Amino acid sequence: MPGIVELPSLEDLKVQEVKVSSSVLKAAAHHYGAQCDKPNKEFMLCRWEEKDPRRCLEEGKLVNQCALEFFRQIKRHCAEPFTEYWTCIDYSGLQLFRRCRKQQAQFDECVLDKLGWVRPDLGDLSKVTKVKTDRPLPENPYHSRARPEPNPEVEGDLKPARHGSRLFFWTM
């Protein structure tokens, strides 16, 4: 029925949350974007194609899982330089990167040495890319409505209007 909305169960929605502050997210954003690029783009493609977040729960869980694993690796290998970096960002008035370049360099060096991750260049993560996915195409990717039936043929002779055109300013 079109009026009934099926909601996912609480078990479908249950995932471990990424409990970090905005400063931590901002400090980790460049490396997170590079490491979790594929699950994030798969999720955004699903959201764009399906136009219904309920159909993208599995992709959302993969994004969450990738973020959790990313922060676990940072905590395991580079906790101290990362803490210094995000604390500096947190205490700089507007969460600006430019005031924390020294801590950023230490964090980037640690991540490169211990995890082999290179900080992406400016603009690398915002480039338009094609996403290869295993998901099937949605049935109606453009969410277009069914075409209406064409107008029926007019039967009989059509006579011109008795008083001319209805557009009075053309008939003056």
Swiss-Prot record:
GO cellular component, one term: respiratory chain complex I
UniProt xrefs under InterPro entries: CHCH, NDUFA8
Protein topology in the membrane: Peripheral membrane protein
UniProtKB keywords: Disulfide bond, Electron transport, Membrane, Mitochondrion, Mitochondrion inner membrane, Repeat, Respiratory chain, Transport
Motif Cx9C motif 2 in this chain: 56-66
Entry similarity comment: Belongs to the complex I NDUFA8 subunit family.
Stated name of the protein: NADH dehydrogenase [ubiquinone] 1 alpha subcomplex subunit 8
Organism: Bos taurus
